[in-house]
């Protein structure tokens, strides 16, 4: 497969030029205007942020993309699907309230917001996975599959189960209905290292399934209740909660890539990722830790695989921030350094598996040419 082109611009802004101006210029250079949008529904998939989290993308960025679509005669809407776990985005009403509280509405974004899998997270379509190895079909939010054109607008950051969250995670996990998310997560569940557990109860507070109790001041997981979402792993400050089988994370990664294939196959797609506020964990948390790496810039491509690879490569070249989770890990005596910021931030992850599987099934290529836009 030939190299894909990924376009990049940094966050440096001379007087009179804003980040929003640069984002618009980036999208145009990357070819968004080559898509025929006249009279067509355009799904712009993004994450509206959990209440309390401040690392999610600002709605101003979404408006740039929505306005570009409208300029081309498109009918854009912002979308995301409900979460597997309880929180502020587990059903459409609370999800819309959360989006509004985090600044997403028709005024700030220039378009409507539609929750992709409906009121209860059950409005889904079973979509074939072309070349699927682990998933023959995927359960995707109905509204997302109803769109004629699909655009992903992703916040690239760390993730406690997948290493990082970028375009493929935003598409694959994010577009899955609640049942679709369960299908992806079903392969792996965390364990407790009782020698390290301090009984602080942070994992229990983070668990949305009421699956963690305490016996003799040590956490205990009820696997009949556990959904395998991994939020408890990110909640623990002492690395007491871990995935006992790294292959489970790898299977999650590969399923996620196949779900992304189901979403993108057979229609025009365009992908944008902003590498900023690079927190160590997912924006699904009701908080965000300090960034582990400095802000890098904005990337865009028709190829989500090349896009994620380019973003990952840029992060791996960056210098870790000392006063951060990653900085603290690297400063620990005896810490096993992987020379990989994602693995040093969240051990027992296999982030390359997502890209490998996506390339294997024909979603895109990891080989890319980077073109810089000023």
PLM-predicted stretches and their roles:
Residues 2-61, 71-80, 85-374:
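Extended, low-polarity segments enriched in aliphatic/aromatic residues
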Residues 66-67:
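Terminal amphipathic helices with adjacent charged low-complexity linkers/tails
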């Amino acid at each position: 497969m030939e190299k894909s082109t990924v376009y990049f611009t940094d966050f440096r802004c001379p007087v009179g030029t804003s980040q929003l101006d640069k984002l618009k210029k980036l999208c145009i250079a990357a070819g968004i205007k080559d898509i025929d949008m006249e009279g067509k529904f355009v799904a712009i998939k993004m994450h509206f942020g959990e209440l309390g989290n401040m690392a999610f993308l600002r709605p101003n960025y979404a408006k740039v993309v929505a306005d570009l679509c409208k300029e081309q005669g498109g009918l854009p809407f912002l979308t995301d699907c409900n979460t597997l776990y309880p929180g502020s985005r587990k059903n459409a009403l609370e999800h819309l309230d959360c989006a509004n509280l985090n600044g997403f509405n028709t005024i700030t974004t220039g378009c409507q917001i539609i929750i992709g899998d409906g009121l209860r997270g059950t409005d889904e379509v079973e979509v074939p996975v072309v070349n699927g190895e682990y998933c023959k079909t995927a359960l995707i939010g109905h509204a997302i599959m109803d769109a004629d054109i699909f655009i992903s607008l992703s916040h690239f950051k760390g993730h406690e189960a997948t290493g990082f969250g970028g375009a493929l995670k935003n598409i694959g996990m994010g577009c899955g209905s609640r049942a679709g998310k369960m299908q992806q997560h079903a392969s792996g569940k965390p364990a407790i290292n009782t020698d390290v557990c301090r009984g602080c109860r942070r994992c229990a507070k983070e668990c949305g399934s009421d699956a963690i109790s305490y016996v003799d001041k040590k956490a205990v997981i009820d696997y009949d209740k556990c959904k395998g979402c991994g939020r408890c792993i990110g909640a623990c400050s002492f690395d007491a909660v871990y995935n006992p089988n790294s292959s489970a994370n790898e299977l999650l990664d590969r399923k996620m890539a196949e779900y992304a294939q189901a979403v993108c196959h057979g229609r025009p797609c365009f992908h944008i990722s902003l590498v900023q506020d690079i927190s160590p964990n997912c924006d699904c948390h009701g908080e965000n830790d300090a960034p582990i790496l400095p802000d890098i810039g904005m990337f865009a491509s028709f190829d989500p695989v090349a896009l994620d690879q380019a973003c990952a490569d840029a992060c791996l070249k960056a210098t870790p921030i000392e006063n951060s989770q990653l900085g603290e890990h690297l400063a620990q005596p005896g810490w096993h350094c992987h020379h990989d910021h994602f693995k040093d931030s969240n051990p027992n992850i296999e982030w390359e598996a997502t890209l490998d599987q996506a390339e294997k099934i024909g979603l895109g290529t990891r080989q890319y040419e980077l073109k810089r836009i000023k």
